[in-house]
Regions:
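Short S/T/G/P-rich N-terminal loop/turn motif that feeds into the first structured element of a domain
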Residues: 1-56, 60, 64-74, 97-99
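Short, non-transmembrane amphipathic alpha-helical segments
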Residues: 25, 82-83
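Short, compact, well-ordered microdomains
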Residues: 76, 80-81
Length: 99
């Protein structure tokens, strides 16, 4: 299994950016056939100091292999998400990939 986690910081000037990122991920990314599991959501506040609360949205995708994740990266729906959703709503992103 290969995991691809993306942490998004939204553009502060766009009050709807978090909702737009979540809706866009549902529309463009969930249907990509090589994705094994899909989960997107808002940051959950926590009283624990060790929990990062600086971001607004997280995306967690799993794939059967690194090769499947590489196919996802060039899939037309992923490219649409980047152009139509990510660029207009996201100020910063950090990605964690692991096996």
């Amino acid at each position: 299994m290969f995991s691809h986690v993306v942490i998004f910081w939204t553009k502060p000037e766009n009050a709807n950016a978090a909702a737009d990122l979540i809706a866009g991920a549902e529309k463009y990314l969930r249907p990509v056939p090589v994705i094994r599991s899909f989960h997107v959501g808002r940051m959950v506040s926590s009283p624990r100091a060790v929990v990062d609360q600086s971001y607004q949205v997280a995306l967690n995708l799993t794939f059967d292999s690194k090769q499947a994740e590489e196919e996802y990266q060039v899939h037309p729906l992923h490219l649409d998400f980047v152009e139509k959703v990510f660029k207009s709503n996201c100020a910063r992103a950090v990605i964690y990939d692991f096996e």
